[in-house]
């Protein structure tokens, strides 16, 4: 009787973790573990892509959207995984999506408050 209960619990736990994995894996988290960071420096936005072990994507495209998800422009990254662009149309915030191909994407959101605070912080320095 105890063996049946143990087996049933094991099967239930296995199924639970299998379903969690199926939901989590396609999310792109496993896809090269691409990370993107964006911040404001004065009147420019700096973007940096990162891969595991300190590596950088050598090629890719950033897509910059406003807070309403309207594409503002796109730009190629530099071979060191960075890009920058003038800070414009930021009143509704910005979403910076980095696409390095083969479905490997990640994004960073700069809210209007983030942008305002980072600009003010830079002016104090």
Regions found by a protein language model. Name each.
Residues 92-103:
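Short, aromatic- and glycine-rich surface loops/edge beta-strands on solvent-exposed regions
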């Amino acid at each position: 009787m105890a063996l049946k209960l143990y087996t049933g619990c094991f099967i239930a736990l296995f199924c639970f973790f299998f379903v969690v994995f199926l939901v989590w894996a396609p999310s792109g988290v496993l896809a090269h573990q691409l990370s993107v960071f964006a911040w404001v420096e004065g009147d420019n936005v700096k973007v940096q892509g990162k891969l595991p072990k300190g590596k950088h994507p050598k090629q890719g495209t950033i897509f910059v959207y406003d807070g309403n998800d309207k594409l503002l422009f796109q730009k190629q990254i530099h071979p060191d995984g960075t890009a920058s662009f003038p800070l414009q149309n930021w009143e509704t915030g910005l979403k910076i999506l980095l696409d390095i191909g083969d479905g490997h994407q990640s994004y960073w959101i700069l809210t209007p408050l983030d942008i305002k605070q980072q600009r003010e912080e830079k002016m104090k320095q």
